[in-house]
Amino acid sequence: MGTGPAQTPRSTRAGPEPSPAPPGPGDTGDSDVTQEGSGPAGIRGGETVIRAGMGDSPGRGAPERRHKAQPGRARKYEWRPEGPTSMGSLGQREDLQDEDRNSAFTWKVQANNRAYNGQFKEKVILCWQRKKYKTNVIRTAKYNFYSFLPLNLYEQFHRVSNLFFLIIIILQSIPDISTLPWFSLSTPMVCLLFIRATRDLVDDMGRHKSDRAINNRPCQILMGKSFKQKKWQDLCVGDVVCLRKDNIVPADMLLLASTEPSSLCYVETVDIDGETNLKFRQALMVTHKELATIKKMASFQGTVTCEAPNSRMHHFVGCLEWNDKKYSLDIGNLLLRGCRIRNTDTCYGLVIYAGFDTKIMKNCGKIHLKRTKLDLLMNKLVVVIFISVVLVCLVLAFGFGFSVKEFKDHHYYLSGVHGSSVAAESFFVFWSFLILLSVTIPMSMFILSEFIYLGNSVFIDWDVQMYYKPQDVPAKARSTSLNDHLGQVEYIFSDKTGTLTQNILTFNKCCISGRVYGPDSEATTRPKENPYLWNKFADGKLLFHNAALLHLVRTNGDEAVREFWRLLAICHTVMVRESPRERPDQLLYQAASPDEGALVTAARNFGYVFLSRTQDTVTIMELGEERVYQVLAIMDFNSTRKRMSVLVRKPEGAICLYTKGADTVIFERLHRRGAMEFATEEALAAFAQETLRTLCLAYREVAEDIYEDWQQRHQEASLLLQNRAQALQQLLGATAIEDRLQDGVPETIKCLKKSNIKIWVLTGDKQETAVNIGFACELLSENMLILEEKEISRILETYWENSNNLLTRESLSQVKLALVINGDFLDKLLVSLRKEPRALAQNVNMDEAWQELGQSRRDFLYARRLSLLCRRFGLPLAAPPAQDSRARRSSEVLQERAFVDLASKCQAVICCRVTPKQKALIVALVKKYHQVVTLAIGDGANDINMIKTADVGVGLAGQEGMQAVQNSDFVLGQFCFLQRLLLVHGRWSYVRICKFLRYFFYKSMASMMVQVWFACYNGFTGQPLYEGWFLALFNLLYSTLPVLYIGLFEQDVSAEQSLEKPELYVVGQKDELFNYWVFVQAIAHGVTTSLVNFFMTLWISRDTAGPASFSDHQSFAVVVALSCLLSITMEVILIIKYWTALCVATILLSLGFYAIMTTTTQSFWLFRVSPTTFPFLYADLSVMSSPSILLVVLLSVSINTFPVLALRVIFPALKELRAKEEKVEEGPSEEIFTMEPLPHVHRESRARRSSYAFSHREGYANLITQGTILRRGPGVSSDIASESLDPSDEEAASSPKESQ
């Protein structure tokens, strides 16, 4: 590997040699597969060969290395090439040392034996047991046929309003206290429950459909002696599965064999960790050799003993017991569910974990019931209203008691009217008033809100501007109850790969000898026809065209140009796949990373074609001439070296060292710094400005005597070549690769940042790649100070010393901050990441936490400084001391809070190398300590847990895999659509629902508080003022349509203005449109309206001698009702800002319904049918026929409207006009001060920012040099040097003893 020893030729290398190979294509007879204590094992006649050409390259004849059997060690250790064995961070291989170690493993699986695996049980509760091993069926839906009704009712009655209505319905069913018909509340309640249940059922049916699509995917399972086509849901633990190229792995499986050499298997894990580069997995050598036929696979009875299912994506320890021998297993032998098989024709695996036991499903988390901030606020407001109604009812009940007592005292001769005691009658009147005033919390408001949420969701589905035509993906609201949350988002947590980027890397530009070549270069003239017709190996998909560069290549005019392309064709780990029969001249490259594939393809198009490789040779075609280079050593990429080097011998005999890597390490090792080097630096700076991913190329010729000396003595290259600064003689140039972003990503992020939304990128990819994308999408900028581990430690030290004072305002105003951290550092820093998620639910008061730690302040600060020193020197993180568990928990909370506070003060946060569980816990931490609305967006299975944890989850469709979509609340086709989803639909939904709630509370109080004032004048008897039909139809017809229009169509600004002025989005983040204060204002406004309507009518009704006189209850009720209806109609007219014909129609229809229904219910013919049901006979006509009464109604409406009109329209307009006049009088203002540009913080010795980013995976060089990865090779192989020839690689070089 890159940090370990490089390789020496086999003739000079001490130690054991690799294992033997099976016969080559031309061999006959039995293969060389052997087992300890047995002779050669061939393939018997009649057996079907499932693996052709498997094994190591021919000519490798030494037996495999084994540990000798020792007493008490009944196991076998198998040698195989050392390489990376984890997906994200390199997992450390853990071999089992003795039998006692196996006792810690609780998971035991036997191959091809379902009966054996099915006997294991686990206790659930009491005596109830179930099968220990889960099936491979995935269920993300919340309900099934039996659980839907009870579970849905249980969830619905978590709403306080539903409980309130249920209590009122129960009280209403008691005849002695009921003041309204039983069906007046029970019918709306049933409708409300039915509507919400239907909505939940539709949402859950979509989940069931997605689950069926996944569970019904086809796979091949070994049944008996053949593989049969089955479904994913039919898989069981212990089954042997056959996977083909491009198949998705259906469960966590132990790799048994593959058609690749040495049973390698290449997998793409972009759906798990977001990395685009390929990773390799390798089967055990024993299964690779022995399981070569279907018959042998069917008779395989090996037993795997391993750790129980867990969420650690990069860790696995176990052993395989087979034929009385044991073989250790690690993550490098495991294929995880969700991976996609790449560049491997066929592989075979043994299912270890299935279904919800798989690692990816362990990281997915549980389905949470998401509630919006307004929904939670409504629960609290319902409690407040209920308590207020109870208090009012108590006051009215006491008033009734005093009234009855006074009546009995003054009218003792009518004592029979009140036969019961005063207390008993007051008790019953209390409940009567409670039922009468229960409509203060109108059930119709909750019913209409369901239609409003549904309608706004439909508008999202219908928005053609969020339709992604290339992949036919429309926007979709999978959850219909979170629309207003879209207008309150403060934090966005985004995946990188597939979310911000397209996963497409293209060769964009290059710089050779200080001259830039590329599509945008002045020297570039785009040809009218294909310039690569002369090259039969050219890839027509490459879009890089440069006529001047092509002319230099074809005329051999510049040696540096030839060396440039020669380096790209030689210095890599790419393999050549077999060409299709119909196109024998077409080369198929197998690249470990898209970066290397793009570089080798570019060299191929310019005439330097990589043809093939063996263990110690590379064959390329240079402008039609085939040349073979002998590979003497390969030094692979790693995170420390940041470069790859290849030492080759040219056909002419000269030895040359080719190196490509980061500019920061290449320039430090140049022989000289001339004009060409400075020109290359300028080109790199320009490439960095364009956010291209760059690599520098350099080489040097190595003298024969130096190489021979190195070969014989195995000394470090830094000692041999003496001068580190002169290790590379000549700089060839630089390459620039474009990691294409999705369309509109930079503009979207810029707009969202203006909306006061903080964007965090959480990715499993490497840090260099993530930072490069951060600059490309303008999340990071050159004037930002990027904080990494050391800076974070220093700042947190200040936090602890200053007692919860993280950063001063002065320090924040000086520079913009960005945070870049990795998952390992988060694991050390945040205690919650090492605990169960329920630890995040523990709330510790911050003041109490500091008080707990105040007693041991000195020791605490000393321990914190010690912890920081431990971090700096790479030692385990020291935890602050605590006297007891509570103090320890307090310190943990403070440590978490410090990190969240620091991150929240940064302009951008990028978390690299994080697991799916870490993504979710980061989101949970922000929610815990900042109580803000969070949104998570991603496209892969590794984003599911994050999407579920966030308040709003958005899944991107159209990428590989739909698991993120199935667990999301909203579906988009591209990241750029998030801008319109939040700023337009989210903001509109928030504005609409807030205006709807405010208006509904206002009109409810305006209409219902009249009952209270009326009770003060009727002896507190509980007699309703209004006609019964007015109460029944008020929220159904008379006032519903305008408020429904507000909830569905209201727009305070247009969609274009919402996008042009993203600052308007802040109103939702600050809860400005509906909060406790707005609620109090609405209630107060409704109370004042009811006072005006009631007492104005009461005042005119006392004028019994005037022309507007009326003294009957019915006329009084009609006048109050009419005043109330017109007042709330004027209020809705003032609220609406988006006027359309539909808006006018809803207002006219509401008034028309009132006129028609009032005339009908108070007509003579209905009175004749049922006088008790329709008692208001011609009351409307007596009111409408009196101009004086109508004038009183108009006066009441005017008194209610004019103050509101002045506050909302006249005063703001005058204030704005006055501000404009003052601005004109003052004239153009001069700048009092100018903001100086922020100083650029240089993290390197040079001022230029390095845009190096390479997604290559460490370990492929060893596979090549050991022959593990090769199908064919020469008759005599040679291992690569065991020491690094890279003269600057002190850490990679090794001594002779180490190589042995």
Curated annotation (Swiss-Prot):
Stretches for region Disordered: 1-98, 1272-1300
Ranges facing Cytoplasmic side: 1-149, 198-381, 453-995, 1049-1078, 1136-1141, 1208-1300
Coiled coil: none
Enzyme Commission designation: 7.6.2.1
Highest taxon listed in the record's lineage: Eukaryota
Gene Ontology cellular-component annotations: acrosomal membrane; endoplasmic reticulum membrane; membrane; phospholipid-translocating ATPase complex; plasma membrane; trans-Golgi network
Catalytic reaction equation(s): ATP + H2O + phospholipidSide 1 = ADP + phosphate + phospholipidSide 2; a 1,2-diacyl-sn-glycero-3-phospho-L-serine(out) + ATP + H2O = a 1,2-diacyl-sn-glycero-3-phospho-L-serine(in) + ADP + phosphate + H(+)
Cofactor names: Mg(2+)
CDD domains in UniProt: P-type_ATPase_APLT_Dnf-like
Active site: 495
Extent of Basic residues compositional bias: 65-74
Any one GO molecular-function label of the UniProt entry: ATP binding
Binding residue positions for ATP: 495-497, 596, 637, 660, 693, 763-765, 913, 919, 942-943
Miscellaneous comment text of the record: Association with flippase complex beta subunits TMEM30A and TMEM30A has not been detected, neither did their coexpression change the localization in ER.
Similarity annotation: Belongs to the cation transport ATPase (P-type) (TC 3.A.3) family. Type IV subfamily.
NCBIfam families, per database record: ATPase-Plipid (TIGR01652), ATPase_P-type (TIGR01494)
Protein name in the entry: Phospholipid-transporting ATPase IK
Species per Swiss-Prot/TrEMBL record: Homo sapiens (Human)
